[in-house]
Amino acid sequence: MAFFTIHPREMEKIILNKHALVLDVRERESYREGHFRGAYCCPYEEIDGWMRHFNRNRTLLVYCEYGSTSLLAARQLSKCGYEVYTVVGGMQAIRRYNGYD
């Protein structure tokens, strides 16, 4: 299955229309410092262990700090059969889109 890149403005639509599970693939400390509402902390290094808990019929939306780690996660998850969306620019872009610097 393929993965798709989206911009922060498209996140709500994917979450609502696809009932996507939102995964923050940054380190736990970064997650604790702030994350997208409703996102689960799923550090990239632990993604193999987490995959068995995800329903393959559920759409996943992943993000990291800048967008590069979430691309790796999206690639890995899509190879395992998940429909995955990743946010271009990561949490930095999400913050800018929502008016935070």
Residue ranges of model-derived segments:
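Rhodanese-like catalytic fold shared by cysteine-dependent sulfurtransferases
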Residues: M1-L21, R28-T59, S68-D101
